[in-house]
Each structure stands twice: as structure tokens, then as C-alpha cells.
């Protein structure tokens, strides 16, 4: 089986490829032949991609139709992680998010349709729903995105599902809660705070810090995505959550305690525009249909994540110096 994985030099995509290889080594899955397509933007790290004979890396843009067509011609299935994901950057540069997240997804869908490739697993986010005060969202909740990032992801979700409804393409959509774990680019809250605290620096906290997020270890996310790929139904949406809800203030307190420092290192900053107050996913469908359950205890997972960043300065220190530019240097010419 030939599997095309987009965005697999990034945080979640690379962990997914590792997940597949580990499942193969343990005999849980037949060995796939994996092609990774990644543009290597500022957040892409070629070293994240496993150095394995089963994995081929192709540097390229998902919006490059001829390239995508040539790769899709050799593929049996697709798992699509590639996306611009940072909310703050989407507010200042929305065009980049529309081009990659919407137009890039369209290019992939067109090529998959031409070559009869499926399933096409489209990986998305809980942010497409907006904000929920109480309870949790089911998969049929109407989308109400509040940032250019989440609007671009909502658009790509709807586009992907339309290819199933219009053309019969085997599209399956996953929507996850906030991820954390090793190899996460240090612009996101957990690695930003952890690396700042390791360096004795201050950490920023938006607004009153009472925005609530549900936390999901990246390995549990990868487990859920692969269950959808192998057992999910065409045209369906599945939620993949971690089950641990924390305010940003609570999360900050946990990280401060882990480093033995007080709140005097926290800088309150003005709240982000359109900052969603609370996210929460109802994951009963994935549990009932696929047997999905998160396996990682949050306290253990966050402790191991801190240890990983403490032990891997050589990975994250160069990344914190990178400008948020169009692309990182290729292998051999950079960190």
C-alpha cells in the first residue's frame, strides 16, 4: 500500500509517520510505502521525518498541481496534515492561510479524484466550531469559525466533504483538540512556555487567562487519525479529543510549578482578536465506531514533554531564531 502523507515534516504529521512505522515493527499493520510531501516552511523540520527505507521525502507545495498529480498517481491513500496553523499569523497574513489550507486542499482533492485515491483523510481542528460556553460539540454542529485560520480550515473541511457528496470520493475528516508533545514548533503555548522557562525567560498570558482548551497528546491524535483511516466511514467526520480541559491560566500554573517559579515571570498581554473562549469535543462517535480512547494521562504526558524539551535544546534553539518566512533551508544547509 502506497500512502501519501502531506505536512509530515511538521509536528503532528511527522509523529504520525513514526506511529505507522512503529505499528509495522510491532506487526499491528502491514508495512506501507510512505511518501512525505512537505514544503518546509519555517515550521517544517526535515529532521522530524523518519530516516527509514519505507519513507521517501519530497519537498514541494501542495498547491503545485503538476507535482501533486505525479505523486497522487502512485498513491493508494492520503492523509492530509499540511496546513498553516498559527492563529496570530493568520490575523496578519490571511492570504497565506487561504492559499495553503483551501487552495492546496483543492489541488489534492482534484488529484485524488483523477487517480481514484482513497481514503483521503483530511485532518482538521475543533476551532472550526468557534466557541462553546457549556457542553461539547457533536460532529453535526454547524461551523462558526472566528479567526482567518479557523475559517480557512472550515472552508477546507467543507470542500473535502463536498468531493464525497458530489463525486463519491472516499473522504474522511478528523477534528482534534489542542495537541501537545515532543517536536511541537515553539510558537505554540506549551513549547513556547517550556522553552522560555528553560532559558529563564518570561512567558506571556493572553487576557484574563480563562480561555479553556481540551488537551490531547500528539500520540493519541495519531492513534485516532489512523483508526479513521483504517476503520472510518466515507463522508464522515470524527472527533479526536484528549479529555483534559484546562484554562490557559491553569496550564500556566502547572508549567510554572514544574519549573519551581512563581507568577512574577508571567507578562499579562492584551487578548488576541477573536479569541475563542472555550473548545470542547464530544468524542462518543469515534469511541463507539472505532474504539478510540486517549491513552496518555495528561500529568504524565506534560512531564515527559517538558523532559523532552529539556533534553533536546539542539532541536528547538535554532527554531526559535527562525523568521516566520516562506521556507526553511534544505537538509545539509541548516539546523
Curated annotation (Swiss-Prot):
Please name the source species.
Streptomyces antibioticus
State the free-text cofactor note.
Answer: Binds 1 NAD(+) per subunit.
Presence of keyword Metal-binding:
no
Task: Show the GO MF annotations.
Answer: dTDP-glucose 4,6-dehydratase activity; oxidoreductase activity
Q: In which pathway does it act?
A: Antibiotic biosynthesis
Write down what this protein is called: dTDP-glucose 4,6-dehydratase
Any GO BP: nucleotide-sugar metabolic process
Positions annotated to bind NAD(+): 11-12, 38-41, 61-62, 81-85, 100, 149-153, 179
Protein family membership: Belongs to the NAD(P)-dependent epimerase/dehydratase family. dTDP-glucose dehydratase subfamily.
Which PANTHER family would you find in this protein's record?
A: DTDP-D-GLUCOSE 4,6-DEHYDRATASE-RELATED
**Could you name the domain of life of the organism this protein comes from?**
Bacteria
Keywords in alphabetical order, please. Answer: Antibiotic biosynthesis, Lyase, NAD
